[in-house]
């Protein structure tokens, strides 16, 4: 069964997650907060890129790259679906290799329990 990533859409959801816990590394910052009274079959996650990272082409490349890695992570590791996640990208995502970013995401999401 393929797991799906659902995007956060309401600004209230973003504000709520920003009040939760935070995990940072050189590529991105992950904010996460436990969902109350929900058993999700979908992963609630959004990827945010700031305008200072570059033009729309670069920002969309970062988002595509991180979404692709997250789809791989869903298949390979046990991600906790009882949390909502907000991933804010940093400029080093564009500069470093795909495999380094992938390994970092895998280890970070295994740490979140």
Language-model segments: which ranges?
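Positively charged, solvent-exposed patches that mediate nucleic-acid binding
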Residues: 1-113
């Amino acid at each position: 069964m393929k797991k799906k990533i659902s995007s956060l859409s309401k600004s209230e959801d973003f504000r709520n997650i920003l009040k939760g816990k935070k995990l940072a590394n050189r590529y991105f910052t992950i904010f996460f907060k436990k969902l109350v009274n929900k058993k999700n079959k979908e992963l609630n996650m959004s990827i945010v890129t700031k305008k200072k990272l570059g033009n729309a082409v670069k920002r969309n490349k970062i988002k595509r790259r991180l979404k692709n890695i997250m789809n791989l992570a869903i298949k390979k590791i046990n991600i906790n679906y009882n949390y909502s996640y907000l991933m804010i990208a940093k400029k080093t995502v564009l500069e470093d290799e795909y495999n380094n970013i992938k390994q970092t995401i895998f280890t970070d999401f295994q740490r979140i329990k």
